[in-house]
Regions:
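Acidic metal-coordinating catalytic centers involved in nucleic-acid phosphodiester chemistry
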Residues: 1-17, 70-347
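Catalytic centers of nucleases
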Residues: 14-18, 24-85
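Generic transmembrane alpha-helix signature in multi-pass membrane proteins
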Residues: 351-352
Length: 353
């Protein structure tokens, strides 16, 4: 992974348009959800070497899939369109750019995926042509004549002479994501995904969508080269654990607000008046939102609070009310974080149980 982080990426995100980003970001989220629901470990890498890389492990990966994510207003992807030259730089074709990764990654490559909102018009091994029902078309289903054209195209593109033949790794995929109302489509996919989880009741879909979209969008836009693996992971990737953390943060924030009535009862018994309570609740909400989107101050406070809570869990478990826990956490955790008071209450609430 150190070589991947330090290597100069082929894709440079700053040169691409916002319109392209919209489809690419949303398609990347859908691919993340697809892999995440299998239970497998992974690390997604955005706009580094290609539109999307999917590593089979978050640490020390053995396999990597590459994806070109392309959107069009109308039509379908024919063999001629897939092998047509785009621009003057080499490799000049979509498939050549995908196959180019065989040079650098060889046997590590598990998939060379071409993902689009449009369908494909390709000849299948039985002599028939693909239809709208063919959503995922691996190379193994394509006619030998088509495979010969694909191999010839990447050879002309100057990337066909690799030590490992990657032509059988091509996969052509049509996804349901369109060019309009992409946010609604992905939110719908999130709803389906969340319903499969035990904590579904507590996860706010819109908040989770905004967090995922914002994270993928930001990481796609980073164009620098990296000197450390840790920096690369932080700025350009999302792992399974990272996405789970997003779910947990969204869940815990919802649970805190759902239990505000109980919390308010403790605060009232402790002598807090309504005006003061409203200010506190707003501070809690601001902290929950800041933490859910990965705001540095909020994540730093969260990390520090987690360490202290783990170190003092036995003592924390001995307290009967939330204000008692807050009072102790305030002593243990000196900080000038702007939403400190709300953060103390949220972290203290999550420390219970």
């Amino acid at each position: 992974m150190q070589e991947v982080a330090a290597n100069k990426p082929r894709e440079k995100a700053g040169a691409h348009t916002m319109a392209r980003y919209g489809f690419q970001v949303h398609a990347s989220i859908l691919k993340i959800l697809e892999v995440h629901r299998t239970g497998a470990d992974y690390r997604a890498v955005f706009d580094h070497f290609d539109d999307l890389m999917m590593l089979d492990r978050s640490e020390q990966p053995e396999k990597v899939g590459f994806f070109q994510i392309k959107s069009q207003d109308k039509g379908e992807w024919t063999l001629a369109a897939l092998t047509a030259k785009k621009g003057k730089s080499k490799p000049a074709t979509f498939l050549g750019r995908l196959y180019h990764h065989m040079d650098a990654f060889g046997v590590m490559v598990s998939c060379l995926g071409f993902v689009s909102n449009l369908g494909f018009k390709l000849k299948l091994i039985d002599g028939t042509e693909t239809t709208a029902d063919n959503l995922v078309i691996p190379s193994s289903q394509l006619h030998p004549d088509v495979m010969a054209v694909l191999r010839g195209a990447v050879a002309k593109d100057g990337v066909g002479n690799t030590a490992v033949d990657g032509s059988q790794l091509f996969v052509f995929e049509r996804i349901g994501l369109g060019l309009i109302e992409q946010d609604k489509f992905v939110k719908g996919a999130l709803v389906e995904f969340i319903h499969e989880r035990e904590d579904a009741h507590y996860i706010p879909v819109i908040s989770l969508y905004e967090t995922l979209r914002g994270s993928v969008f930001t990481k796609s836009g980073v164009t620098e080269e990296f000197t450390t693996e840790a920096e690369f992971y932080d700025r350009k990737t999302l792992s399974r654990a990272d996405v789970e953390t997003m779910f947990l943060r969204a869940t815990s924030g919802r649970r805190f607000l759902d239990n505000w009535g109980t919390i308010a009862g403790d605060l009232t018994a402790n002598g807090m008046r309504s005006r003061r309570m409203i200010v506190l609740k707003n501070s809690c909400i601001l902290y929950i939102k800041a933490r859910s989107v990965g705001e540095p101050g909020a994540t730093a406070f969260n990390a520090a609070a987690r360490d202290i809570i783990i170190a003092h869990q036995t003592e924390i478990d001995s307290y009967e009310t939330l204000p008692e826990i807050v009072a102790q956490l305030e002593k243990w955790l000196p900080s000038d974080y702007e939403h400190r008071e709300g953060a103390l209450y949220v972290e203290s609430f999550e420390a219970i149980g």
